[in-house]
Amino acid sequence: MSVISMKQLLEAGVHFGHQTRRWNPKMAPYIFTERNGIYIIDLQKTVKKVEQAYNFIREVAAEGKDVIFVGTKKQAQEAIQEEAVRCDMHFVNNRWLGGMLTNFSTIKGRIRTLEELEQMEQDGTFEVLPKKEVIKLKLEEEKLEKNLGGIKNLNANNVGAMFVVDPRKEKNAISEAKILGIPVVAIVDTNCDPDEVDYVIPGNDDAIRAVKLITAKMADAVIEGRQGEQLAE
């Protein structure tokens, strides 16, 4: 029983690559054919690659390590947040701030500011402050929540894998993962460089359904791995 079926991939449109003029020749092994100026991805390879990525993510989770989900393009934002929350992992879906992993102590300071602002809102401090100041503080809180809300509980030393939608868009995140020796799993479309990624999942990174399907599978792998970890205890 494979992790994902050809039918699921087809229905979600995972096989649609980019236009033929926008391609990376390194993706040639994953291309099945070309139709109407668009590359069609070889889904038999995608099935195998999803399985490899799934097994790897499951192992990472079973070892008690964390996975960080990264996807800041519009088509990925919702799936990245929903699936990371579902499997109780960390996510970045608005903007990758430089140093999120490599300079985590600075980022941790910003997270503390966010937590302090949340505390002020909850304990009624906002109610006694001048209105102008409250507006300013709320804007700051919203901005921090957007960028850091998904990594509030992150321990940067315990990240065992990074899952990425569109390595071209998330090159900063990937380069930080590389510096720290964190393996990268990614949905890689026909216009991306697969060499940047440790576990390549060839597929459409522009269709919401395609992104959701594969991201959900990675979240399933985390959940399965964590159950294994609990059983081992």
UniProtKB/Swiss-Prot annotation:
Alphabetical list of Pfam families matching this protein: Ribosomal_S2
Any one GO cellular component localisation term in the record: cytosolic small ribosomal subunit
InterPro entries: Ribosomal_uS2, Ribosomal_uS2_bac/mit/plastid, Ribosomal_uS2_CS, Ribosomal_uS2_flav_dom_sf
Keywords: Ribonucleoprotein, Ribosomal protein
Database matches in SUPFAM superfamilies: Ribosomal protein S2
PROSITE patterns: RIBOSOMAL_S2_1
GO molecular function: structural constituent of ribosome
GO annotation terms (biological process): translation
HAMAP family in UniProt: Ribosomal_uS2_B
Protein family per UniProt: Belongs to the universal ribosomal protein uS2 family.
Protein name as catalogued: Small ribosomal subunit protein uS2
Species for this entry: Clostridium tetani (strain Massachusetts / E88)
